[in-house]
Amino acid sequence: MSALRSFQRSSNVAKSTLKNSVRTYATAEPTLKQRLEEILPAKAEEVKQLKKDYGKTVIGEVLLEQAYGGMRGIKGLVWEGSVLDPIEGIRFRGRTIPDIQKELPKAPGGEEPLPEALFWLLLTGEVPTEAQTRALSEEFAARSALPKHVEELIDRSPSHLHPMAQFSIAVTALESESQFAKAYAKGVHKSEYWKYTYEDSIELLAKLPTIAAKIYRNVFHDGKLPAQIDSKLDYGANLASLLGFGENKEFLELMRLYLTIHSDHEGGNVSAHTTHLVGSALSSPFLSLAAGLNGLAGPLHGRANQEVLEWLFKLREELNGDYSKEAIEKYLWDTLNAGRVGPGYGHAVLRKTDPRYTAQREFALKHMPDYELFKLVSNIYEVAPGVFDQHGMTKNPWPNVGSHSGVLLQYYGLTEESFYTVLFGVSRAFGVLPQLILDRGLGMPIERPKSFSTEKYIELVKSIGKN
């Protein structure tokens, strides 16, 4: 009898413990994936109703010059994470860059937003708590190990192969790890696509710092990583440590800022659109991002900061220490009159100073106000818009993000310009992968716009008549 009572007491304790455990779990903050499971059904229904009620509504017109002009300004894509206003600049889920700098969680003692928190925001439209952000940092760290064949592929790449080519190759090789590809091959229902796309995206983001760092250390140093991923560190801090800059607290802050503000810029730019386009064919996140990285590698897209630095070095040499506004203005006019352009100024959409430029300028004013290259960039900023506006070089004579980021990296000793686009690529993954997950969750179809030949366009415009 005593034994029975003892058993009952033990059983009650066990039940109480289980009950408390369940209660604790039930009241714990939801994970990112759990929040998506809660959010997506309502979002999908909203889109379904929108198409039902307004599916035949005209949302814009297309001019012939747009068809021949890179499709600029054509309303034809859905991109949930960010919207680019020509005057205000980018808004992430309705929030400006100053907003996210203020609202998003930060590292202990840090002042810059964490890219993990932005990833959460872009996916859900919500600002995560510090605990949720920390959990995401830990998940990225836990899933960071590279498959052996990817490590060997990077290590065997010749050092003269451009870092972006190596980056794309390594990301493509991660296709072997794709849960989405495996699930699709087994016939998983399309309502489950987003879950496997989510898992692949987390896995991919987790592995990018190690891939980027191995490429950097192989091409420019001794091939050895100076650190390992630390589960106690945030994403930007781990990336900085792997590159060899982990002891510099300011550089850690720069990586957090850099990864956040370079992440997303609407869906029409080459890297974002390419990732979305390839993903619309139900290619995995690994193949889709690799395609986007190849677009980012193009000199008209992700190479701007490298070209700006090359131009600044030449300008510095020619000015020979005279960084006066008068000397800079003369050089700019000589450049324009010679048929060349001033890199780092102008944008396809923006008509004011890029707020991403402003964020980097404020960082420089705080951390490197006396740095020679920053002083030069700062003086150019005060002179160039007036010169470019007077000349008519661009509809937007204001600086873009590419005119400043390279200077910040140079200051801290990351001077290898050909690697800069790899950092851009790591950052851009934080913007394009959330949309890929949402594409699958909302059941977005394969992209297939209509094309015409020039002869067909001639026939078409003649039938319509001139304006």
Swiss-Prot record:
NCBIfam families (UniProt xref): cit_synth_euk, PRK09569.1
Its recorded reaction(s) are: oxaloacetate + acetyl-CoA + H2O = citrate + CoA + H(+)
**Any one GO cellular component localisation term in the record:** mitochondrial matrix
Cell location: Mitochondrion matrix
GO molecular function annotations of the record:
citrate (Si)-synthase activity
The protein's name in its UniProt record = Citrate synthase, mitochondrial
Where along the chain is the active site annotated? Answer: 301, 347
EC number(s) per entry: 2.3.3.16
Family stated for the protein in its record: Belongs to the citrate synthase family.
Q: What is its main location?
A: mitochondrion
**Which species?**
Candida tropicalis
UniProt pathway annotation = Carbohydrate metabolism; tricarboxylic acid cycle; isocitrate from oxaloacetate: step 1/2
- Cite any additional comment in the entry: Citrate synthase is found in nearly all cells capable of oxidative metabolism.
Q: Which UniProt keywords apply?
A: Mitochondrion, Transferase, Transit peptide, Tricarboxylic acid cycle
